């Protein structure tokens, strides 16, 4: 087993990131096989339970109210629609449902009550439940935990130095504080970032340093490639190279060997061969289904065909226990 470290330096991470690509993939694949069943990949499904109208100014996001992106704004979905989506996702091979709401932060109101009911209902389907709802306080995190929430997603997006170029309506420390509240409630942490925002390689390395130097590594780190959306400030950003994705995934796998590395947004632009490189580099989770909130994504059928071709198997839910059980870091997976 690989040693778990929480004291990585930027210089060490940079040296890993800049390793010749094939050597980097080989090293990451070796670490992956030492710590995980390399052929086992968790399938997650992501749905938007409240879309658009967000007061924040995230430069990449089509759900920000201040941008004219043509997003179909809607309020909270009925619980019945969420259950139906969860059942469809489970039938397609997903073991986790992530519910996203376009909020700046959680508020103690009827909508949050509805989220609690949704968490309980999806949990009853024997699926892991994840939420991404913006900032939340300790009491709200505990309420979600009591309802059976397995994971909470709150991405850092980019480095602390680059952050204000992308978002001004909440601080980097706000994000880190939310992660602390999630951890204190014994909910597993999902936090990663986006490449292709116009950041530098140093920004990518700095973000990975922040994540890997948390008191406990996130159980899941999503690596997203920007999907430019017309109407947002980043609409004209050039597409990021798939090899940059491979480097990010491989570096993440090496410095956080027991963390699940999720191949997230941007897969529609990747061939099966390119995605295979991502799995070789240590990715062991993906989002399946036609949409990731508001952006396109490969279908369940397409992904199942890829799994068959590559010899991958979907991971079952709750392999390491239910949300409120103490999860061993040596076996934790999202």
What are these regions (language model features)?
Residues 20, 58, 154:
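Residue-level signature of catalytic and energy-coupling elements of molecular machines
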Residues 26-67, 74-100:
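N-terminal pre-triad scaffold of radical SAM enzymes
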Residues 41-45, 97, 129-131, 152-154, ...:
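Hydrophobic faces of well-ordered beta-strands that scaffold small-molecule active sites
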Residues 42-48, 68-71, 98-111, 162-163, ...:
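Glycine-rich, proline-tolerant flexible connector loops at the mouths of alpha/beta enzymes
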Residues 47, 133, 171, 193-196, ...:
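Glycine- and other small-residue-rich loops at beta-strand/loop junctions that grip anionic moieties
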């Amino acid at each position: 087993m690989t040693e778990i470290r929480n004291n990585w330096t930027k210089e060490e991470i940079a040296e890993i990131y800049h390793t010749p690509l094939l050597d980097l993939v080989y090293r990451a694949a070796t670490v992956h096989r030492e710590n995980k069943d390399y052929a086992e990949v968790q399938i997650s499904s992501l749905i938007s339970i409240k879309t658009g109208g967000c007061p924040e100014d995230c430069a990449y996001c089509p759900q920000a109210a201040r941008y004219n992106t043509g997003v179909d704004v809607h309020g909270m979905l009925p619980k019945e629609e969420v259950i139906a989506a969860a059942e469809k996702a489970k039938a397609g091979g997903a073991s986790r449902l992530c519910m996203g709401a376009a909020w700046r932060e959680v508020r103690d109101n009827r909508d949050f009550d509805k989220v609690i009911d949704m968490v309980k209902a999806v949990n009853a389907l024997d699926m892991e439940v994840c939420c991404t709802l913006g900032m939340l306080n300790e009491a709200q995190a505990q309420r979600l935990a009591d309802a059976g929430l397995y994971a909470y997603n709150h991405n850092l997006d980019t480095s602390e130095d680059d952050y204000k170029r992308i978002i001004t309506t909440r601080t980097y420390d706000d994000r880190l504080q939310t992660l602390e509240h999630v951890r204190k409630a014994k909910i597993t942490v999902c936090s990663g970032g986006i490449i292709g925002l116009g950041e530098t390689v140093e920004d990518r390395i700095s973000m990975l340093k922040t994540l890997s130097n948390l008191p406990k590594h996130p159980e899941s780190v999503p690596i997203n490639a920007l999907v430019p959306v017309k109407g947002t400030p980043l609409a004209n950003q050039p597409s990021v190279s798939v090899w940059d994705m491979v480097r990010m995934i491989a570096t993440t796998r090496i410095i956080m060997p027991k963390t699940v590395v999720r191949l997230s947004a941007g897969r529609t632009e990747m061939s099966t061969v390119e995605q295979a490189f991502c799995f070789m580099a240590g990715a062991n989770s993906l989002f399946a289904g036609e949409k990731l909130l508001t952006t396109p994504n490969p279908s369940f059928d397409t992904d199942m065909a890829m799994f068959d071709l590559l010899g991958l198997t979907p991971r079952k839910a709750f392999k390491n226990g239910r949300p409120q059980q103490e999860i061993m870091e040596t076996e934790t997976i999202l």
